[in-house]
């Protein structure tokens, strides 16, 4: 996930609002990126502790890492518990109305609240603008999908020298089903029952005879990150049925 800093010229909400369409990120690039506004103020140790303005990417990465370790990659790194530790202030203190102008554009705002201090107050990807209506609108949904893609791919590399038939497919369903069920029990997916939270499909429908001839096994995994039974689909492909030499 790419954390994008606001441009130096974005000194006002209006500048950010007018500049957002010019970021020139589309498709998967935008799905894998998130932008945060405004810049932050911190003490600069190289200037004797003088407070200076810095880009927020470092502290945002820290918030993400803290959220991952405490709650899981599926938890949004935003809200009152997503505090900006060590941040002395923000370049701009925003109102709810100003936040309401930027959030629908996919710009995540950093806010200051009484008692709670400075926090991350948005969790959208750069495909998160309301007008885009993208299934990867939210940072935790996209990061969970990336986590699943990598984990499931690595977890099925053993199939390469196995016969590409129903016993293999059944073992894949069993292994990946156990992995997904463990995440379900941790609260990664929506739904009170496993069937509403995730599914794993690997059979003669996903892997045709032509796929078998080509030495390919296809796996389809769905997970419900926002609402029960509303699945985001991940498709995996591995080599199988190869002859060890």
Per-range role (PLM):
Residues 1-245:
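Structured, hydrophobic secondary-structure cores that serve as assembly/anchoring elements
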